[in-house]
A protein has these predicted regions:
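Cysteine-centered metal-binding/redox modules
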Residues: 1-178
Length: 178
């Protein structure tokens, strides 16, 4: 059986470094990543992709996306399935190395946003936003928010949240239920 080289990339195409559970502050819900976690023991996508076929992601599979992948996406509970499919397409097109390098860049920007603009109620909101937005959009949002670093946290957080929502509307993204 192959060991995943990219433990922070789900077989399904999920970018673990942008997942709300990866950034959770609760030890009960925190996940170390799809390739490192005990979750993979029950993940049928992991079993099929890595254990049975020795693939790094489903992007390597000729029948992807398959029903197993869709069933897995329904179980997760975050609005991420469309992004998984987009990610698998990008991995197939550009290679996992290039795709994951961008994910790490997004992660660094996410961690900066969580450090300066997070009011303890928006972690999932930030993670999903950074998962869906293109890197240039994220850089633009974070750069614009930098000017407010000296403001009170609640004001910074509200302003950043509004900017992110506005950007989502401009890109016709419906990421959140609200």
């Amino acid at each position: 059986m192959k060991k995943k080289q990219y433990a922070l990339v789900g077989c399904c195409g999920m970018s673990c470094v942008l997942c709300p559970r990866f950034h959770s502050q609760s030890s009960q819900s925190k996940c170390p990543g799809c390739g490192l976690s005990s979750n993979r023991e029950t993940c049928t996508t992991y079993k099929c992709c890595t254990e049975q076929h020795n693939y790094e992601t489903c992007a390597e599979c000729a029948v992807s996306p398959c029903e197993r992948l869709f069933l897995q996406a329904d179980w997760v509970g975050f609005n991420t399935r469309k992004k998984w499919l987009d990610n698998l397409s990008l991995i197939k097109q550009n290679g996992i190395e290039q795709w994951f390098a961008e994910q790490l860049e997004k992660q660094a920007l996410l961690e900066e946003a969580l450090r300066y603009f997070h009011n303890n109620r928006m972690r999932s909101f930030f993670c999903l936003s950074f998962l869906y937005f293109q890197i240039d959009t994220i850089k633009k949002l974070v750069a614009a928010a930098q000017a407010q670093k000296n403001e009170e946290l609640q004001k910074r957080a509200a302003s950043f949240e509004e900017a992110v929502k506005s950007e989502a509307i401009q890109h016709n993204l419906k990421i959140w239920d609200k």
